[in-house]
Amino acid sequence: MHETGKITRKAILLSYWVDEHEKFKSDLDFGLVKSFLKSAAGGCFRDEEIGEYASVFFTRKSLFELLDCYDYMFVYFSGHSLFENRQVQIPLKNSEVIAESEFIRPDKKLWIFMDCCRTQREPMNSPDFELPRKENLFPQSCPQRRENWVFKISQMEPFSLIYYVTKLGEFAFSNAIGGFGTQIFFTTLMEKLDSETTFDFGQLVREINQSPIAIQESSYIPGSLDLKEFSSLF
């Protein structure tokens, strides 16, 4: 499952949808995220290291058990969520929920990616937007790049990076082929990695927010994470 003696890792992609059309959009977003995860920039994840789930598959207990099993986890969520006490609340099985802060586990390394609204306001229609799905330009996976990535993250101190596709109190929009935040993050990342030799995560987020096609503003909480060290993973 992973390089022996270095680090255990898992990516879990979660979604909450209410009809087949929303499930279709979620599946497209999952595909884009998986393209990144399987690439050299994302860590050369193998299929068995990536789990795709409806969020209601999990109870709180079973999700916590999964989170506690690995040294590094990439957690992605898209779809409908609740919002309470200034936190995203993800619906789970048996009407349970998990708050975004509860994903953070002691002594673990986590990147949490939230493509959902962060407001209690009544939903509004998404503005029109079009982000063409581009060919996969992420750097290709290979055994050496995988080994290097695993070694680098194994040397990092525990961290919890939370990336939000929208600001506190705002909506996250989508169209027929998925969430705006997921699409613009990974397509912009793809373009930068294809054209630049030095990558900077903070600069990526600034460019996303300054894009002339931006309809929402992303943000992130790095906690104790060394962003320069994290950027070297890409």
Language model features with spans:
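Cysteine endopeptidase catalytic domains of the caspase/legumain-like
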Residues: M1-F234
